[in-house]
Amino acid sequence: VGFKAGVKDYKLTYYTPEYETKHTDILAAFRVTPQPGVPPEEAGAAVAAESSTGTWTTVWTDGLTNLDRYKGRCYHIEPVAGEESQFIAYVAYPLDLFEEGSVTNMLTSIVGNVFGFKALRSLRLEDLRIPVAYAKTFQGPPHGIQVEGDKLNKYGRPLLGCTIKPKLGLSAKNYGRAVYECLRGGLDFTKDDENVNSQPFMRWRDRFVFCAEAIYKAQAETGEIKGHYLNATAGTCEEMMKRAVFARELGVPIIMHDYLTGGFTANTSLAHYCRDNGLLLHIHRAMHAVIDRQKNHGMHFRVLAKALRMSGGDHIHAGTVVGKLEGERDITLGFVDLLRDDYIEKDRSPGIYFSQDWVSLAGVLPVASGGIHVWHMPALTEIFGDDSVLQFGGGTLGHPWGNAPGAVANRVALEACVQARNEGRDLAREGNEIIREASKWSPELAAACEVWKEIKFEFPAMDTL
């Protein structure tokens, strides 16, 4: 076959509607908005080509490989209801295109280059199907839901957390004091804010030492296991590992990482260290909204959540449905299931485009955090269930009597909701009543109820189905 130079349509090679997907293929669903005049088949094929083996012109070296074996294929196109110029393109990638155990390589291939493509007005990766063969090359979460419950000896209820505020400006000693008060009052965890790393007003080593002291003091006084998410995120991987090692030497149960700003390579290294050394790993998703908030361009958070489960983390922030940050109920529940369950059935109503089998990859606890307070407790308990972490920053530290009473109020509200649920009451309908009853015998809860009775964050969600 002679080499024929020149430019040819992508769809001739990369649009293959008759293709039967293999169980080893990585499948992707893209929401494509082409430029005017670009037909859907060509746009879908262009996405498949540019994110796999293709380039803009025929190249001589194509003859040296078996393209049929390695090319991505656009195998199905479906219209988007209510959007004229938009459609979902399904692309299948052969497994051999990806390095084993590397989320970094997977994302570089699938979303690395194609989003700047001129023939498209916008492009959004809605979902990925990770084949079992690829999932098995990842360690996944350091410990997972089951082991975490056993390590903490806490069962049958959501865990309670609190982000220490003001997030920047406290000295290490005062920071540790706030940690102690919250844990002593009844919380399971406190948390470094995502941007607390090692700043001039509080260097990381001082913070780690004072927080460890707070943890041990609170444990001794309450007889419960306590933790503080020590943020190990740093400017270099070496510095990050140094912080993780120091945390292990202090004997604390859990550390934390900002996985998107820190990067997947750093995150996976840290997750491996955590498993090898018995540390739990809390993951914060700082920067996610830059990537996932626009409906037409970027990546849906469910893809970032899947990537995190592969890279490794025991907790991850997943929206609240009821607080101050973005998160529609169905969509949020869609990726909460995706984080916790072994097998998720394809279901388009919460936006699940593919069935996903995680085989034996451990589950991740979803964390609800952001603008939530005691009045939200019944809804949160009902929406997230026992395998979750509910995090109240201002909702603890904003209590009129101080941090410890704020923690007491949250713990009482939670225990009341769990008890009511276990007695068969309907949390969605009777939620306010349950909180009111509990506040009769808890002055701390009564004071919290009074402060936050009118607070709501109500704006329409940006990302709808």
From Swiss-Prot:
EC number of the protein: 4.1.1.39
Listed GO CC annotations: chloroplast
General remark: The basic functional RuBisCO is composed of a large chain homodimer in a 'head-to-tail' conformation. In form I RuBisCO this homodimer is arranged in a barrel-like tetramer with the small subunits forming a tetrameric 'cap' on each end of the 'barrel'.
Any one Gene Ontology BP term: photorespiration
Subcellular location: Plastid, Chloroplast
Active-site residues annotated for this sequence: K165, H284
The name this protein goes by in its record: Ribulose bisphosphate carboxylase large chain
Pfam family, one: RuBisCO_large
Residues that bear N6,N6,N6-trimethyllysine: K4
UniProt catalytic activity: 2 (2R)-3-phosphoglycerate + 2 H(+) = D-ribulose 1,5-bisphosphate + CO2 + H2O; D-ribulose 1,5-bisphosphate + O2 = 2-phosphoglycolate + (2R)-3-phosphoglycerate + 2 H(+)
Function: RuBisCO catalyzes two reactions: the carboxylation of D-ribulose 1,5-bisphosphate, the primary event in carbon dioxide fixation, as well as the oxidative fragmentation of the pentose substrate in the photorespiration process. Both reactions occur simultaneously and in competition at the same active site.
Residue list for modification N6-carboxylysine: K191
Keyword Signal: no
Marked site: Transition state stabilizer: K324
Quaternary structure, from the entry: Heterohexadecamer of 8 large chains and 8 small chains; disulfide-linked. The disulfide link is formed within the large subunit homodimers.
InterPro entries in the cross-refs: RuBisCO, RuBisCo_large_chain_AS, RuBisCO_lsu_C, RuBisCO_lsu_C_sf, RuBisCO_lsu_fd_N, RuBisCO_lsu_N_sf, RuBisCO_lsuI
One GO MF term attached to the UniProt entry: monooxygenase activity
Keywords attached to this entry: Calvin cycle, Carbon dioxide fixation, Chloroplast, Disulfide bond, Lyase, Magnesium, Metal-binding, Methylation, Monooxygenase, Oxidoreductase, Photorespiration, Photosynthesis, Plastid
PANTHER family for the chain: RIBULOSE BISPHOSPHATE CARBOXYLASE, RIBULOSE BISPHOSPHATE CARBOXYLASE LARGE CHAIN
Main location: plastid
EC supergroup of this enzyme: lyase
HAMAP family: RuBisCO_L_type1 (MF_01338)
Cofactor: Mg(2+)
Protein residues bound to Mg(2+): K191, D193, E194
Cofactor note: Binds 1 Mg(2+) ion per subunit.
